[in-house]
Amino acid sequence: MNAASTDKPRLRVLAGCTAVGKTEWALRWAEAHNAEIVSCDSLLFYRGMDIGTAKPTAGELARVPHHLVDVCDVREAMNIAGYVAAARRALTEIAARGREALVVGGSGFYLKAFFGPVADDVEVSAAVRAEVAALTPAAAVERLRQLNPPGLGALDTANPRRVVRALERCLASGRTLAELSAAFARQPGPFADWDARLTVLDRDPVELNQRIAARVAAMLAAGLVDEVKRLLPAGLKENPSAARAIGYREVIDLLEGRLPAASLAAEIEKNTRALVKKQRTWFRTQLPDHRRVDAAVLRDAGGLFDF
């Protein structure tokens, strides 16, 4: 966790897994503290992805100013660099208005950016990308080993995407993985100018599973299938991150004949539970020390943060 600092603007970050209840508690806290909300949900960026993302309703958005919601067409993929730039702009503008900022979301990699570096400064040329792309997976691993005589450390060589990324950066920088890792650790995070503190909202797993089931039923009743039908001609499948999102990918499978209608709700529930498990692990292992709050026993939004 960032050390407390009196010369940095305070930044509160509220994280939590899917269906835990972040939206309502964030709204209550923001209303009580004259704050504005900066979304840290990788799917709320996209216009039209409303039902399947449990996007705040028009009424909820009207209660508190929100940032980074509905900022991209569905075919325009957001990435970490774009998110960081947009979030920094939003935070700077909020501070200039003399208001508090509350970052809210469950997208682990984006959340991590508020507490440390998430991207290195290595620029990979098109020529290097083409050179690596021409290699078979086995050849890529072998080339990477040649460039790293001390070894590959904890790199998962069975993951082609990670091997490609590592090899591209070694070739582009002329450095070993160990050297790149050491340089990365010395980088300041993109939000080092803020004193960020984290609270993770959680619930008992049995209760959370019940909320997931209710949420899926409500989404289907609200017209999730029709939402996906509208988004497909708008370019949903051109954006893999959006098309693979839980709720959307299952409906796509339904519409393309790979999933029977009778199995739709159960499939979305199953995949949501798996996502929640991954989110919990990420929050525990990848985010800094934080305060954990049980949403089921929380009575006042003031109890979310201790500073």
Curated annotation (Swiss-Prot):
Enzyme class: transferase
Positions that bind ATP: G16, C17, T18, A19, V20, G21, K22, T23
EC numbers, comma separated: 2.5.1.75
Start and end residues of each stretch annotated as Interaction with substrate tRNA: 41-44
An example Gene Ontology molecular-function term: ATP binding
Cofactor(s) needed by this chain: Mg(2+)
Biological process annotations from GO: tRNA modification
Keyword Thylakoid appears in the UniProt entry: no
Catalytic activity from the UniProt record: adenosine(37) in tRNA + dimethylallyl diphosphate = N(6)-dimethylallyladenosine(37) in tRNA + diphosphate
Annotated InterPro entries: Dimethylallyltransferase, IPT, P-loop_NTPase
Site (Interaction with substrate tRNA): S107
Pfam families in the record: IPPT (PF01715)
Chain residues that bind substrate: T18, A19, V20, G21, K22, T23
Protein keywords: ATP-binding, Magnesium, Nucleotide-binding, Transferase, tRNA processing
HAMAP family hit by this protein: IPP_trans
Function: Catalyzes the transfer of a dimethylallyl group onto the adenine at position 37 in tRNAs that read codons beginning with uridine, leading to the formation of N6-(dimethylallyl)adenosine (i(6)A).
Stated family: Belongs to the IPP transferase family.
Summary of subunit composition and partner proteins: Monomer.
Designated name of the protein: tRNA dimethylallyltransferase
Origin species: Opitutus terrae (strain DSM 11246 / JCM 15787 / PB90-1)
